[in-house]
Amino acid sequence: RDDDAHRAVLAAQQAGDRVGVPWLGRTCGVCPYCRAGRENLCDRALFTGYDLDGGYAELCVADERFCFVVPPLFRDVEAAPLLCAGLIGYRSLRVAGDGERVGLYGFGAAAHIVCQVALHQGRDVYALTRPGDDRAQSFARSLGATWAGDTGEGPPVELDAAILFAPAGELVPKALGHVRKGGTVVCAGIHMS
């Protein structure tokens, strides 16, 4: 994010204007990770709803560096998912690169948002769920996924990138096996076994 542009937008806000406060609520701002734009890796990070009040609040005190102006076209219920699952998913999609065939391992909150963004970008989405999760597979297909199946069978094509949202470490070698040579595997979950 362009910090100068972000500060300018926030400076134009008035008291009472609506902003969104994401999961990452504050960092030290001086460590190598913060200086490199990788604040999510800061050892002194504080998280909204965990370390900081505000996860389900209508009002809270927040660090302006981590606030986003919410355009009026979004209702609160539409904007809120973008501030947690949406940010995690979008960042993961950016890290995954521009490949055409993207595999999403686990199809929950972040993956269903990424699916829609990737499809909008013209990519093919392959959704992989735990075996027997027909509901999630059906949901992925209803959003437009090219293919949806379980992690046991794997996708029908070689992937350019794989994004793991499921907290199951045993999926890492599977994803590596499903991605083409030189492809990218992104471990996007907050926790993984």
Descriptions of predicted regions:
Residues 18, 101, 183-184:
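Short glycine-centered segments of the SAM/dcSAM-binding site in methyltransferase folds
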